[in-house]
Design a protein with these regions (language model features):
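A glycine- and small-aliphatic-rich helix-loop capping segment at beta-alpha/alpha-beta transitions
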Residues: 46-57, 80-82, 144-153, 212-214
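Short glycine-rich anion-binding loops that position phosphate/pyrophosphate groups of nucleotides
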Residues: 38-39, 69, 133-138, 144, ...
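Glycine-rich N-terminal segment of FAD-binding domains in flavoprotein oxidoreductases
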Residues: 26-52
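Short beta-strand segments
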Residues: 33-37, 65, 102-103, 130-133, ...
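Class I SAM-dependent methyltransferase SAM-binding "motif I" and its flanking Rossmann-like core
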Residues: 136, 140-184
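ATP/nucleoside-binding phosphotransfer catalytic cores, i.e., glycine-rich phosphate-binding loops
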Residues: 182-185, 189-243
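N-terminal glycine-/serine-/threonine-rich phosphate-binding loop
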Residues: 1-32
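Ligand-binding beta-strand-loop-alpha-helix segment within the catalytic cores
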Residues: 56-128
């Protein structure tokens, strides 16, 4: 288990960005998974800025998103597809066939989830997975009590997020919203993981993730058992650790 603590947000974003860039440079055919959210947006944009200044080969890289909101338009600003496309894919010029996402709309989400994880496997599996950390320890849409052996699936999102999305999209109450996500089993199959967390609001869950027991109460605690996982933190997020 490797823990990297950065001094400030600039160093945090730069370190994370170079983890992604280094993977692409070392293996141009890499399969790289990305997560959306407040923690990762700036580091994605930084990857794009560095690429714009110093172009390198990206046309054989496959990117995919860890999760997606269901039953909203794909063009919705809060859809993971739109966020990743805006933050990085457009800047890198990644073609749609090399940008894999779970669908926002599907007639059969169970089949769509199976197809998604199979396509990742067909491309050789996950070389690098960048994970964010929820304040309750969730990974993607794998909330507390999600099974450690679970594969890609659709689960309910938390109430606060669901209410915000309904307001922003005008989705009526009778239309169910969910979160399609790779399961924890899929996550643990990644050859390399970098979990990123910053800010004092993450300090408590970081401590529980790294120093507490491995438990479904804190889904991210399973990463203690991954053979090649780096925990990239800023000083605020690491402030409660004993190490």
């Amino acid at each position: 288990m490797k823990i990297t603590i950065t001094k400030n947000e600039k160093e945090f974003d730069c370190t994370a960005a170079w983890r992604i860039i280094g993977q692409m440079l070392n293996k141009p055919e890499s399969v790289i998974g990305l997560s959306t959210g407040r923690t990762t947006g700036n580091l994605h944009r930084l990857v794009g800025e560095i690429y714009t200044q110093y172009p390198f080969k990206v046309d054989t890289v496959t990117f995919f998103g860890l999760d997606e909101v269901t039953n909203v338009p794909r063009e919705y600003a809060g859809a993971c597809y739109t966020m990743l496309k805006t933050e990085l894919m457009d800047t890198l010029g990644i073609k749609e066939e090399n940008f894999l996402m779970l669908p926002t709309i599907s007639g059969d989400f169970e089949q769509s989830c199976r197809d998604f994880q199979q396509e990742i496997a067909n491309r050789g599996g996950i070389d690098l997975l960048i994970l964010g950390l929820g304040e309750n320890g969730h990974l993607g849409f794998n909330q507390p009590e999600s099974p450690f052996g679970g594969e890609a699936w659709v689960t309910r999102m938390n109430v606060e997020l669901e209410e915000r999305i309904r307001r922003e999209t005008g989705t009526p109450p009778d239309k169910e919203l969910g979160g399609a996500t790779l399961g924890i089993k899929n996550i643990m199959q990644a050859r390399r993981i970098v979990l990123v967390a910053k800010g004092t609001n993450k300090a408590d869950i970081v401590k529980r993730m790294l120093e507490g027991p491995v438990t479904t109460d804190v889904p991210a605690s399973i990463l203690q058992l991954h053979p090649n996982c780096e925990f990239l933190l800023d000083e605020a997020a690491a402030s409660m650790l004993n190490c």
